[in-house]
């Protein structure tokens, strides 16, 4: 099924002020034009702002404030298996910041999470300390 993580799901402090709870999210943000970006070739890991820019350019799509951006990761191929929770593509901070700077307020994915898979995050942590 579908669900929405409000900004407060990710922490209690943000650069833009206190993150909103879901009951404080304007409903009209969820009833806007959307574009689907295909990142299904990436595999396990993350994409950054540059890949998002490339996909928007490939589609010749110019994001307007409050547009919705959806990511097709190909995660559905893992439906019904444990890999659904571990083998997907998330977004790094630069991708999220880029979308927010464009005025995007709703980002969606067909993956289990918008974050990088936990295993990927742990591997990066071991590499960088």
Regions found by a protein language model. Name each.
Residues 1-129:
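Active-/binding-site microenvironments in catalytic and ligand-binding cores
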């Amino acid at each position: 099924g579908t669900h929405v993580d409000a900004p407060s799901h990710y922490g209690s402090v943000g650069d833009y002020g206190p993150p909103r709870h879901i009951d404080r999210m304007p409903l009209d943000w969820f009833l806007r034009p959307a574009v689907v970006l295909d990142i299904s070739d990436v595999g396990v890991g993350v994409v950054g702002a540059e890949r998002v820019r490339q996909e928007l350019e490939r589609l010749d799509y110019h994001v307007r404030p409050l547009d919705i951006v959806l990511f097709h990761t190909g995660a559905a191929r893992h439906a019904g298996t444990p890999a659904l929770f571990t083998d997907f593509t998330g977004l790094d901070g630069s991708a999220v910041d880029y979308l927010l700077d464009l005025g995007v307020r709703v980002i969606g994915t067909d993956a289990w999470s918008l974050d990088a898979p936990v295993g990927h995050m742990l591997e990066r942590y071991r590499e960088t300390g």
